[in-house]
Amino acid sequence: MMLSLPKLSAGGVVVLLATLLHTLTVQGASVRHHRLRGGDQGGFLAPSSDMIKALEYIESLKQRADGPESPTGDYDEVDKFRFLVQLASLQDENTPTHEDATRWPDNKVPQWVRSLLRVLDQAGESPESQAAGNERRLHKTRRPVADGESPAGDYAGFVKPHKKYPLMFEDEENGRDNKRATEDLDEQYTPQSLANMRSIFEELGKLSAAQKRDDEEDGEDDDDLYRVRNAAYEDVTGGEEWVPLEEQLETEELVKGSHEEYKRALGDISEQGMENMERRGEEEDENPDDDTKLVDYYLLKVLEMTDQAQKRDLMEGRRRLLSRPSLIDPRAIKQLLSAISMKLQVPPEDLVGMLFMEETRKQQQRLPEPQLARNPSQPRYKSRVIKYYNGRQPEVTVSDIPHDVKTEDILKVLGLGNLANKNAKFSLLKQRPYKTAMTNYFNPNGRRGSLFLSELNKAPSKRKDDYDDDDAVDEDEESTFLAAKLLTEYPDTSSSNRKRAIDSAANGQLPYELYEEAMKDFFDQVDNGKSALAKRDTQGKEEPEGPQKPPAQDPAQETVDQTPPESGTEDGKEYHGKIVAGM
């Protein structure tokens, strides 16, 4: 199979490129590629006769191919050849440019060019016979020629019919088309072309291997030369590395300068350290009190800060109290006061005054009372236990009586308004006798009554102010002792005690006179064998608050009788409690 005209033109282009690159020893596939990689190379070799013949033949083929329509061939093979040439040029970049073609290994490049020319000569023997059949075969990327524009060829002796008329022999037409397609494929890939391609690849491989061997040999030669030089230098210098004299001097000067600078810096640092230490020692010697002054300063600052913090806390507390809203509405308080005043028929002003008085009284009660000198015989704590022997509970206790209640009001309530005078007030306050129970001397139940002994010892000292006669005082003490003893053993639980107390208060009798009357009644009862106490109910007899109790009473209930009177006001209060309790 012979190559067609388009194939011939493509082959000519490839041959031209190959001859320009390899015969002239230009390292690169093209001038532009070579410029990009290394720049222009100067100097060219003289062209050979084979190259001139190839160029002349390519020009003749191009002139033959020029016509009314120059179809473009398939550029696949052209691209392949260009790629191969570029690969060869990349492998041969380091080859010298001014060498002759005869220096190539085994003189293979001219043979490769000759083989390409031989293939082209064989393909160019009958180009005219295949020109008509290959006119319609265009490049695959180009647009096919229209039917109206294409020349009316006979297609191997068969006239192409018109489109309107169908073909009579379709099988023959299809067979002819298939033959043409296979012919094109055979023309593209012939055994001869494949063999040529294989030979080209082999030549390129040999070229690259030879170039590698040359590079390795050159490197080994250089290494051998370097080793020889090193061995000779070591023999002369004794194994030391060879350095130029100027560089050696410069390095020595640099090392010396660095050592000197290092030593100088160390000296400066040591001198500065010594100076600083000496300066600090001098300052410490000159100012030994700086530390104490500093500590005092900080202490003062801390104290000032604490004072300021305390002041700030006080101000914040006051602000908080001032800014706190009232929990009670003043209007609600006003309405409450008006409602209470209307219910009690009391003006609101009086209600407010009463509230203020009650509040002040409570505050006074909360205040601690001044501690008085205590007798060692008195108990530290006392409790009041009120006893009632008539079986009736008190209607009003002492705590229920207001503080400002007067004695005259109580007497009026009890129906004793005729006693509301000064003597009555005095007698009521003094009506309570001295606590002279003789349980200290004689206690049949074994209960302790040491408090009565102290009260008995106190009573004569008080009566000495009223009487100057010592004999009378002794008699009074004896009578008081005997009366208390008798009343303790034989208590009188009759209801006439209250009447006697009131009558004795009206008569102005003092407590010790009552004790004398009790003694007389007892002696009369013993002599006559009769009870004289019932006959003398109207004359009055007040028995002490404590002695009138059965012997079997609970000892915890005697504490109220064992407490001494602290003042006249307290006696008055207890008297009120006693009188009201008997109602």
UniProtKB/Swiss-Prot annotation:
Mention one GO biological process in which this protein takes part, according to its record. Answer: angiogenesis
Phenotypic effect of disruption:
Defective hindbrain central artery development due to impaired migration and proliferation of central artery cells. Activation of the MAPK and PI3K/AKT pathways is inhibited. Hindbrain arterial and venous network identities are not affected and there is no effect on the Notch or VEGF pathways. Decreased courtship behaviors and reduced spawning success. Reduced levels of gnrh3 in the hypothalamus and telencephalon and reduced levels of oxt and avp in the telencephalon. Reduced levels of lhb, cga, fshb and gnrhr2 in the pituitary.
Q: Which InterPro entries match?
A: Granin (IPR001990), ScgII (IPR038858)
Q: What is its main location?
A: secreted
UniProt-annotated location(s): Secreted
Is Signal there in the keyword field?
yes
* Keyword entries, A-Z: Angiogenesis, Cleavage on pair of basic residues, Secreted, Signal
Membrane listed as a keyword: no
GO cellular component assignments? extracellular region; secretory granule
| Ranges that cross the membrane | none
Which residue stretches belong to region Disordered?
A: 123-159, 526-583
Compositionally biased, Basic and acidic residues: which spans? 534-546
Query: Which residue positions does the secretion signal occupy?
Result: 1-28
User: What role does this protein play?
Assistant: Neuroendocrine protein of the granin family that regulates the biogenesis of secretory granules. Required for neurovascular modeling of the hindbrain. Acts in a non-cell autonomous manner and is required for migration and proliferation of central artery endothelial cells. Required for normal courting behavior and spawning.
What PANTHER family does this protein map onto? SECRETOGRANIN II, SECRETOGRANIN-2
State the family named in the UniProt similarity comment for this chain: Belongs to the chromogranin/secretogranin protein family.
Q: What is this protein called?
A: Secretogranin-2b
Query: Which gene underlies this protein?
Result: scg2b
